[in-house]
A protein has these predicted regions:
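Catalytic Walker B motif of ABC-type/P-loop ATPase nucleotide-binding domains
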Residues: 133-136
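C-terminal boundary and immediately downstream tail of ABC-type ATPase nucleotide-binding domains
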Residues: 197-217
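H-loop/switch region of ABC-family ATPase nucleotide-binding domains
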Residues: 169-170
Length: 217
């Protein structure tokens, strides 16, 4: 699928200006960049949460699922929170088991820890099939064991459903583990894109090299 090029301006300052982009189906495209590079704004615009300056659709005819950085559970059980995005108890049980929160199914979601809430939110978004699944820092609150389980589930979902996954992440290691393609943002602009391992192992742009060196890659 392809996005149109677009810009986003805040208080007279252009914070994001991107060209037309391809987001392949059946693949995970990771978006990396320093804080303030425009990653989350990009995600919100694609998801329709915010509007680009052009005030026209960035994607057309595409169903989009969006998982924000921070999720706020409803005042109901963990299982019922997950079922708000699809009435399929068997699927909910499968997802909760995969992320090791099955024992919390009947517990009030308001009592979950940050990591447990993140796992519940990921289960909830994966209840439905989408053409494009946008995940904004989905594992930040998780420990490493849960992160690896979540990554496995995301990869399996992508492969089984053929959806395109756009993964916003601050973790270069995470991008290396599960991403097929990589987009690198710097100060609101796309400075590099390509096959993930190729970009990480042999970046073509100086700003990409500096970013990777700063994060110790």
């Amino acid at each position: 699928m392809k996005t149109t090029g677009f810009t986003k301006t805040y208080n007279g300052r252009v914070v994001l200006s991107l060209p037309e982009l391809s987001i392949p189906k059946g693949q995970i495209t990771a978006v990396i960049g320093a804080n303030g590079s425009g990653k989350s704004t990009f995600a919100k615009i694609l998801a329709g949460i915010e509007r680009a300056d052009e005030k026209k659709p960035i994607l057309s005819g595409v169903s989009v699922g969006y998982l924000p950085q921070k999720s706020f559970p409803f005042r109901m059980s963990t299982e019922k929170n997950i079922l708000t995005n699809g009435n399929d108890p068997a699927r909910a049980a499968e997802l909760m088991k995969a992320l090791d929160i099955g024992m919390l199914a009947g517990q009030s979601a308001k009592k979950l820890s940050g990591g447990e809430t993140a796992r519940m939110a990921l289960c909830r978004i994966l209840m439905r099939r989408y053409d494009l699944l946008i995940l904004d820092e989905p594992t930040t609150a998780m420990d490493m064991e849960s992160t690896l389980s979540a990554e496995k589930l995301i990869r399996e979902t992508c492969g089984e459903t053929g959806c395109a996954v756009l993964l916003i992440t601050h973790s270069i290691s995470q991008a290396r583990r599960i991403a097929d393609r990589l987009l690198v943002l710097h100060r609101g602009k796309l400075i590099e894109q390509g096959e993930c391992q190729q970009v990480l192992n042999a970046p073509a742009q100086e700003e990409t090299r500096r970013f990777l060196e700063f994060y110790g890659l």
